[in-house]
Design a protein with these regions (language model features):
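Surface-exposed coil loops of outer-membrane beta-barrel proteins
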Residues: 1-62, 106-112, 190
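Sequence/structural signature of outer-membrane beta-barrel proteins
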Residues: 8-12, 41-54, 84-90, 109-115, ...
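Residues that define the transmembrane beta-barrel architecture of outer-membrane proteins
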Residues: 18-22, 59-63, 122-126, 156-162, ...
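Residue-level signature of outer-membrane beta-barrel architecture
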Residues: 28-30, 69-71, 132, 168-170, ...
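Repeated loop/turn-to-beta-strand initiation elements of outer-membrane beta-barrel proteins
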Residues: 32-38, 63, 69-79, 87-90, ...
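Transmembrane beta-barrel strands of outer-membrane/channel proteins
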Residues: 38-42, 79-83, 142-146, 164, ...
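Outer-membrane beta-barrel translocator/channel fold
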Residues: 83-101, 179-201
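Outer-membrane beta-barrel "beta-signal"
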Residues: 166, 238-250
Length: 250
C-alpha cells in the first residue's frame, strides 16, 4: 500500500522500514477478497557477509505477516505484524561501534526512536493501512503503527506513528496524482527510566505533492514538506523543505 509522496515517511507505514533488502516471500490468495503475505528479509549488505552477527540467520532480520482485505474495487485495508532483530548498531557513545552492522530503526522519525541504546534490539510491530476511493477523483488513505522495542538486557520502549492523506487521481491530466498528507513520524512515547526519557513533544509531518505525468515513461513530482517541532522538541524551529523527484521508466 505504498503511496505517491516524495518523502520516505509519506510513502508507507514506517514499520516496514525496520529492515529491507534480500527477501523470501509467499503470497497466497484465499479468494478475490483476502490475500496473505509472508516474508523474511535480511539487509543486502548482511546477507552474504560471512562475519559473526551477519548472514541470513545470524544477524539483522525482519519477518512479516500481512493480511489484506480487498473489500471492493474502491477500498482495501491491511493488518500487519513484523518481528525484527538488530544486533547492536553502536549508537551509544560508551560502546565501540561495529561498522559491519546495519543501523537499527525505520530511517524516519526521532533520533530516540531509531536508537538501539548500544544493545541488540528485538522489535514486535503492528500496523494498519487502508485506502478508500470516494469518487474517481478523490481517495483517502492512512495508516497507524505501534512497535515495542526490547533493548536486550537494558529495558523496553514503545513507538507510535500514524498518517492520513487525501489523494486526487488524474488531477489535471490522466496518470497524474495530487496529494496532501499529515502524520506523526515515529515517536518514542515510552521508555524505561534507566534508559532516560522518551520523546517529550509531538512533531507533525505535513506534505503536499503533485506527481505530473510528462509522458508514459517520465514523471515529475514537486513537493513541499513542513515539519513542526523537529526531533520532538517544540523549542526547535519548524523546518520547511522543497523537493522535486523525477522518475524515468524504461
Amino acid at each position: 500500500m505504498d503511496g505517491n509522496a516524495v518523502s520516505l515517511f509519506g510513502l508507507r507505514n514506517p514499520i516496514y522500514n525496520y529492515n529491507a533488502g534480500t527477501d523470501l516471500g509467499i503470497r497466497h490468495f484465499f479468494n478475490d477478497q483476502i490475500e496473505l503475505n509472508l516474508g523474511y528479509l535480511v539487509p543486502s549488505n548482511n546477507a552474504s557477509n560471512p562475519f559473526p552477527q551477519n548472514g541470513l540467520f545470524d544477524g539483522t532480520y525482519s519477518s512479516l505477516a500481512q493480511i489484506i482485505f480487498n473489500l471492493s474495487d474502491t477500498s482495501r485495508f491491511g493488518l500487519s505484524y513484523i518481528n525484527s532483530y538488530s544486533p547492536s548498531g553502536g549508537d551509544d557513545p560508551d560502546v565501540e561501534p561495529n561498522t559491519e552492522l546495519t543501523p537499527f530503526g525505520t530511517s524516519t522519525g526521532s533520533n530516540l526512536s531509531n536508537s538501539s541504546f548500544g544493545s541488540p534490539v528485538s522489535v514486535n510491530a503492528y500496523g494498519f493501512s487502508g485506502t478508500f476511493r470516494l469518487s474517481p477523483g478523490l481517495a483517502i488513505s492512512g495508516w497507524a503503527g505501534y512497535a515495542n522495542h526490547r533493548y536486550i538486557a537494558r529495558g523496553d520502549g514503545s513507538m507510535w506513528t500514524w498518517a492520513a492523506s487525501l489523494n486526487f487521481p488524474d488531477l489535471g491530466k490522466e496518470g497524474s496524482v495530487g496529494g496532501i498528507l499529515v502524520g506523526m513520524e515515529p515517536r518514542l512515547t515510552q521508555l524505561d527510566s534507566n534508559l532516560g526519557s522518551p520523546d517529550r513533544d509531538t512533531s507533525l509531518h505535513l506534505e503536499a505533492f503533485y506527481k505530473y505525468a510528462l509522458t508514459d515513461n517520465i514523471q515529475v513530482t514537486p513537493a513541499i514538506i513542513w515539519l513542526t517541532a523537529p526531533d520532538r522538541n517544540a523549542d526547535n524551529d519548524d523546518i520547511i523543505i522543497g523537493a522535486i523527484r523525477t522518475v524515468f521508466r524504461f
